[in-house]
Every structure is written in structure tokens, then in C-alpha cells.
Amino acid sequence: MVRVKRGNVARKRRKKILALASGYRGAHSVLFRVANQQVMKALRYSYVGRKQKKRIFRRIWISRINAASRLNGISYSQLIHRFKKSNIDLNRKMLSQIAVLDTVAFKTLLNA
């Protein structure tokens, strides 16, 4: 029988997966097969989560802008329309920060 010398490579690969799975409950952090499945699933979730994070933050910014603009008697869609017409180029993240932290500046933006 031919001898295959790959012990170091295989051990290194398994240890890498088990290190990624440390902190998982039960066999998910001890057994290689189960740990490998869980790590692959976790990496998929983290990839999707990074995409969802951007959507979630945009929704938060829009709802904050909407709440602040309605306190001043204008809806969100009308506010964005006004900004587009008067060439005010502020993104939603900046607008929400201004709306939450500096209400006076937000009111002056509404009147512009």
C-alpha cells in the first residue's frame, strides 16, 4: 500500500475549522463534521447579515428623518422632493444625524 503523507495538512485544516467553531454549543464545537457544517452556515449568515445591515440602517435613517420632518409639518416624501429641487445634496445618514442632534439646523434646512 502506498503511504500518503498529509497528516500535517489535514490536522491544520481541521484545527482551523474547530478554532472557528469554538464557542458553539455541544458537539458543534468538538466534532469536525458538525463543526464544519456550522461554520459554513455561520459564514453564510454573516455574509447575508452584512448586506442586510445596510438596508436596516437606511430604514432607520428614513424613519428618523420622517419623524423629525413631521414635527415640522412636512412629510418625508415632500422633504426629499424639496431637497432634490433645491439641489441640497445631503444623504439620509447625514440628514438623520442633523435631525436628531441639531434640530435648529434641521429647521433651517426645511426652510431652504
From Swiss-Prot:
The domain of life is Eukaryota
Query: Which cellular compartments is it found in?
Result: Plastid, Chloroplast
Per UniProt, the keywords (alphabetical) are:
Chloroplast, Plastid, Ribonucleoprotein, Ribosomal protein, RNA-binding, rRNA-binding
Q: Name one GO biological process term.
A: translation
InterPro entries reported for this sequence = Ribosomal_bL20, RIBOSOMAL_L20_CS, Ribosomal_protein_bL20_C
Asked if the record carries the keyword Ribosomal protein, the reply is: yes
Q: Has UniProt tagged this entry with the keyword Protease?
A: no
Q: Which GO terms describe its cellular component?
A: chloroplast; ribonucleoprotein complex; ribosome
What does the record give under GO molecular function? Answer: rRNA binding; structural constituent of ribosome
Q: Which family does it belong to?
A: Belongs to the bacterial ribosomal protein bL20 family.
| Function comment | Binds directly to 23S ribosomal RNA and is necessary for the in vitro assembly process of the 50S ribosomal subunit. It is not involved in the protein synthesizing functions of that subunit.
> What name does this protein carry?
Large ribosomal subunit protein bL20c
Q: Which organism is it from?
A: Phaeodactylum tricornutum (strain CCAP 1055/1)
Q: What is the lineage of its organism?
A: Eukaryota, Sar, Stramenopiles, Ochrophyta, Bacillariophyta
